[in-house]
Regions:
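A Lys/Arg-rich helix-loop hairpin that forms a DNA/phosphate-binding surface
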Residues: 19-22, 35-60, 207, 233
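Feature representing long, continuous alpha-helical segments
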Residues: 119, 144-147, 151-155, 184, ...
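Conserved tyrosine-mediated DNA breakage-rejoining catalytic core shared by Y-recombinases
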Residues: 101, 146, 155-195
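Short, basic (Lys/Arg/His-rich) helix/loop patches that form interaction surfaces
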Residues: 41, 126-130, 196-208, 215-236
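Short, aromatic/basic-rich helix-turn unit that serves as a nucleic-acid recognition element
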Residues: 1-28, 89
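N-terminal DNA-binding recognition helix of tyrosine site-specific recombinases/integrases
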Residues: 19, 27-37, 63-98, 149-151, ...
Length: 236
């Protein structure tokens, strides 16, 4: 990636604007953070990459960093460009990720579910073998009530709950993605979900569910509830 950035920088003022370089530096930062967290090293050789790498990177960007699909699409495009450059220069034996399709995503604000769709989700019932489905549904509903991102929801604990002078319950936390302090007054539905999902065996407010599992469950929930709009974690 450093080779690609250096090549692009040599074109500044010719066919590339200086401002556009920030996207490449952002991609480099996200890749490095992912590699350090996942593999506990500062860099990987092309021979160490598998086709699954890009999907794990996607789960990291969307789940842990809280980015939208349109943001990851740019990261994936840069990664593919780097792999083509490496193959061309003889640094990689295979053309990695060439046939992997990544959805572009929508840069516009995600469309929200209407009350009818939310009521359909609330009405769903699950048996003992569908615990993850029930958890995904409740976490998603809590996200709808609060507007909080998945990565923030999974880190919320009892210390983030505060009461004002009127006795109303609030969430107070810093967003992982931006560091901005958020204060969210909890609606009655959100309070009921906290009580429902409460457990003395953990410190977090909500049960942990892995991001890929969460997304898969949301797809299944949509079909089961008969909701036509293809919602994701970002829709909340």
């Amino acid at each position: 990636l450093d080779m690609l950035i250096k090549e692009k920088e040599s074109h500044i003022g010719i066919d590339i604007k200086e401002g556009s370089m920030s996207a490449y530096h952002s991609t480099r930062k996200r890749l490095q953070e992912f590699i350090q967290r996942k593999y506990h090293v500062s860099d990987l050789a092309f021979s160490q990459l598998t086709e699954n790498f890009i999907y794990e990177l996607q789960a990291f960007c969307l789940g842990e960093l809280g980015h939208q699909q349109s943001t990851f699409f740019r990261v994936a495009a840069d990664l593919k460009t780097v792999c083509r450059l490496a193959y061309r220069e003889g640094l990689a034996d295979t053309l990695l990720f060439d046939k992997v399709h990544i959805e572009r995503g929508d840069k516009k604000a995600p469309k929200a579910l209407d009350k009818e769709a939310l009521d359909k989700l609330k009405a769903l019932c699950f048996d003992e073998l569908e615990k993850e489905m029930g958890t995904a549904r409740d976490v998603f509903l809590f996200a709808c009530y609060t507007g909080a991102a998945y990565c923030d929801l999974m880190e919320l604990s009892k210390k983030h709950l505060v009461r004002d002078d009127a006795g109303s319950l609030w969430l107070k936390f810093n967003r992982q993605k931006t560091g901005v302090l958020c204060r969210i007054k909890l609606l009655p539905g959100a309070v009921r979900l906290i009580e429902k999902m409460h457990s003395d065996e953990r410190e977090t407010l909500l049960p942990h569910i892995k991001y890929p599992t969460y997304q898969s469950c949301l797809k299944a929930l949509r079909l089961r509830a008969g909701i036509s709009f293809p919602f994701t974690s970002h829709t909340a």
